[in-house]
Amino acid sequence: INPPVVLPTTKHSFVVKKLADQAPWIIGRAGMHYRDLIPDRLGGSIIASHIRIPDGGPVPDMVHYHSVGFQLIFCYKGWVDLVYEDQGEPLRLHAGNCVIQPPEIRHQVLYASDNIEVIEIGVPADHITTIDHKMELPNKTVNKNRRFKGQKFVHHKAEEAQWEKFRVPGFISRDTGIAKNTKNVAGVHIIRPEKNKSPETYHDSDILFNFVMEGNMILSGEGKEPFKLS
């Protein structure tokens, strides 16, 4: 049985979540700690989690896959060793780098540094995770151009990226290449300011998610009090 992925209609809202809010850490799969960044999940359309592994070392994970529409892993602090179907030998995901896990690509978390933290985004919020007891990784086939449900695996490395003007004046960004390789299912940019202030702007995305990695900023939303983020 392999039910289709159902993408719920997004229930749009303006949400700000701070680490200082003392949201609880929940112990989840393979002993990882999870903190929910979008509690209402916009009607089930998205889940965003802040994940940490306090004690580094081998991770008791198994080869598995997710039945999703989109999934991002962004390494915020530390590093983690991962292995993916058809992508060759294991890779080390360093802070500032990210991968997308295309729908149903088999993968496994192998080893983590102390106090690693990642941001994981999944669409939709509720999706099925399946253990693959038959596959061993790395597998013999290497096909880095393979598409999984129309999406290609992406491993974005900060040191190889180029900074360019962002769509919002006053910022520059590095494009991860995710939009191109998912056929615009999602896009991911890392941005930084060139100026202290930017003009009012808007977007036409279904969902826009921002995460402040370092520094601080003031976010003003229409009809909202300004939020200081850090």
Regions found by a protein language model. Give the residues of each.
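Short, conserved beta-strand element in jelly-roll/cupin
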Residues: 51-55, 64-82, 121-124, 190-194, ...
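A generic beta-sheet turn/junction motif
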Residues: 41, 86, 111-113
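Conserved, short, structured surface segments that act as functional micro-motifs
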Residues: 110-112, 117-121
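Short histidine-centered beta-strand/loop micro-motifs
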Residues: 60-67, 84, 91, 110-111, ...
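Conserved hydrophobic/aromatic beta-strand scaffold that supports enzyme active sites
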Residues: 34-36, 48-50, 72, 90, ...
